[in-house]
């Protein structure tokens, strides 16, 4: 039996990679919510057995502060930081794969690995030098801005003490990123916004570059996969 895939595998792999990140986040976020709820129930159960008023006030204050710090600040921050890191890693990997595939497919004379600079700089130069369609200025700007956030997380654990003026202005003008105690606080919406954008960016790029994205297969009849 002959099976015909009506898509290029690089398109499928890219779509799947970003979908996996979204699934991971949904699972992890749900687990944090469950643990948070159980911890609050444990605190209330423990406090029910405290009869002395002063002791109750001391323990409740301590336990509720610890709960807030852990489940409203620490864990959400760790989750969104890991989310940003995973999105960036996938973005970098898939851009490398796209450029390498174009290099082989079109028998180009310039490879991405021969270029220097940031991820956005190298990709922009690669597309411009070879007069390729698919990625525009808005896409490059998005990659650049997201890279700065990722780098601040990786190299400074989100601390903004040594942040560049460009990064500070970017954070100041975004409504889903703030700072608290001079550390980045990233909302879930920021991560989902960029995950959605990069998925669409690749889809548009594949279309303009002539890749097949009809995610169906054919044998004796056409079936969705």
Language model features with spans:
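Extended intrinsically disordered or low-complexity regions, especially N/C-terminal cytosolic tails and loops
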Residues: 1-85, 137-144, 148, 164-225
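Conserved short aromatic-hydrophobic micro-motifs
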Residues: 90, 150-153
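Short non-catalytic regulatory patches outside canonical folded cores
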Residues: 95-148, 155-156
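Substrate-binding/catalytic groove segments of enzymes
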Residues: 154-164
């Amino acid at each position: 039996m002959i099976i015909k895939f009506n898509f290029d595998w690089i398109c499928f792999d890219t779509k799947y990679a970003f979908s996996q990140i979204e699934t991971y986040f949904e699972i992890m976020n749900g687990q944090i919510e469950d643990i948070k709820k159980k911890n609050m129930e444990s605190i209330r159960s423990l406090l029910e057995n405290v009869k002395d008023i002063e002791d109750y006030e001391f323990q409740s204050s301590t336990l509720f502060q610890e709960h807030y710090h852990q489940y409203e600040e620490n864990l959400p921050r760790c989750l969104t930081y890991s989310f940003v890191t995973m999105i960036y890693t996938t973005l970098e990997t898939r851009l490398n794969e796209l450029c390498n595939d174009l290099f082989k497919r079109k028998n180009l004379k310039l490879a991405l690995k021969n270029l220097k600079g940031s991820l956005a700089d190298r990709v922009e130069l690669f597309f411009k030098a070879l007069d390729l369609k698919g990625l525009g200025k808005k896409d490059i700007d998005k990659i650049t801005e997201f890279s700065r956030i990722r780098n601040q997380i990786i190299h400074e654990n989100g601390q903004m003490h040594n942040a560049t003026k460009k990064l500070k202005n970017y954070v100041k003008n975004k409504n889903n990123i703030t700072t608290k105690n001079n550390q980045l606080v990233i909302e879930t919406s920021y991560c989902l916004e960029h995950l959605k954008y990069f998925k669409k960016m690749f889809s548009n790029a594949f279309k303009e570059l002539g890749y097949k994205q009809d995610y169906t297969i054919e044998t004796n009849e056409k079936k969705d996969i």
